[in-house]
Structures are given as structure tokens and as C-alpha cells.
Swiss-Prot record:
Gene name in the database record: dut
Coiled-coil positions: none
Family indicated by similarity: Belongs to the dCTP deaminase family. Archaeal dUTPase subfamily.
EC number: 3.6.1.23
Function comment: This enzyme is involved in nucleotide metabolism: it produces dUMP, the immediate precursor of thymidine nucleotides and it decreases the intracellular concentration of dUTP so that uracil cannot be incorporated into DNA.
GO molecular function, a single term: dUTP diphosphatase activity
Family matches, as NCBIfam families: PRK02253.1
Protein name per UniProt: Probable deoxyuridine 5'-triphosphate nucleotidohydrolase
InterPro entries referenced in this protein's UniProt entry, alphabetically: dCTP_deaminase, dUTPase-like_sf, dUTPase_archaeal, dUTPase_trimeric
SUPFAM superfamilies xrefs: dUTPase-like
UniProt keyword annotation of Hydrolase present: yes
Top-level taxon of origin: Archaea
Length: 171
């Protein structure tokens, strides 16, 4: 498993399909070892969810979209939120990705929770934003909040991601 560099990421962005669609400013979003994703929207998480072994009883909690102010900012009190990214990711069958919050979030008492991004996944993903800071946290629309780190696999997978989140939020 090898972490991809910005040079390798640029080639994958120019490929078809592009590794990353809908980037706001790809030159800013490409980092030495990853790609930064930007904030499209913030939602509340209302109610409980459920997960089981075969997903037949999976339930996702509801939530409502929070509005940014006229200046593009939103103040989030301490709590948990769901965030949606602007970018659509197309992960080739020989790569997987791990996401990490930008260090600025952590320095502000806020973090992101996310899962492994599987080979073959395509979509505009969501993550959980956790505001630990008792004073809250301000976010501006389109802020760079997460960095995706792409790794080459030892071999291409035979079957890529095919779960319910395939092509999520792309329409």
C-alpha cells in the first residue's frame, strides 16, 4: 500500500472518469499527499439510527438542512452534524482512500468522523462533523474541511463498492 503524491493525483484528476469532479479550485485543493474536499451543506442529525448485520433493518436518522447566512457563514453550537461535500469522488478499482479532518478544525475543537472510501466508490459523500468546542464553531460555505488520502492496493479488486451509497448525492 502506497500513499499517492500530488503528482499522481493530478494524473488521476485528468483521467476519465476524473478522480475528483466539481472541485472549486483544484490547484488549492491538491495537497502534497491528498485532496481537500469542501463544504456544500450542513444538516442536523435528529433521532436515532440502527444498523444490523445484513442492513435489512438499517435506519438512518432524519435531519434538516441548516442555512448559511447572507455572508456565507454559519455558527454551529457544540454538537454533532452531518456535512455534505461539493465534490464527487470516483475511486478506481486499484485505490482506496482514508479521510482526515484538516488540522485547522482540530485546533478549533472540531473534528470529522468518516469511514474508509472503498475501491469502486462513486459519489458525493457525507461525514459527521463533531463540534466539541463549548463556544461552537463557525464555518463558511465551500470551506476546505477534509483531506482524502489515496492509497494504491496490492492488486485491483475483483468487485468494487456496490452498497446503497454508490452514486449518493450525485443527482
Amino acid at each position: 500500500m502506497t500513499l499517492l503524491s500530488s503528482t499522481e493525483l493530478r494524473k488521476l484528476i485528468q483521467a476519465t472518469p476524473s478522480l475528483l469532479e466539481n472541485a472549486i479550485d483544484i490547484e488549492t485543493q491538491i495537497q502534497p499527499n491528498g485532496l481537500e474536499l469542501t463544504l456544500k451543506e450542513v444538516k442536523t442529525i435528529d433521532g436515532s439510527g440502527a444498523v444490523d448485520f445484513d442492513n435489512s433493518e438499517r435506519q438512518l436518522p432524519d435531519g434538516k438542512t441548516l442555512e448559511f447566512g447572507n455572508d456565507g457563514w454559519i455558527h454551529l453550537p457544540k454538537g454533532i452534524y452531518k456535512v455534505l461535500f461539493n465534490e464527487i469522488v470516483n475511486i478506481p478499482m486499484n485505490l482506496a482512500a482514508i479521510a482526515k479532518p484538516r488540522s485547522t478544525l482540530i485546533r478549533c475543537g472540531t473534528t470529522l468522523e468518516t469511514a474508509v472510501w472503498d475501491a469502486g466508490y462513486r459519489g458525493r459523500s457525507e461525514s459527521m462533523l463533531v463540534v466539541y468546542n463549548t463556544e461552537g464553531f463557525r464555518l463558511k460555505k465551500d470551506a476546505r474541511i477534509m483531506q482524502l488520502l489515496f492509497y494504491t492496493l496490492g492488486a485491483e479488486v475483483e468487485k468494487g463498492y456496490s452498497g446503497i451509497y454508490q452514486n449518493e448525492n450525485t443527482k
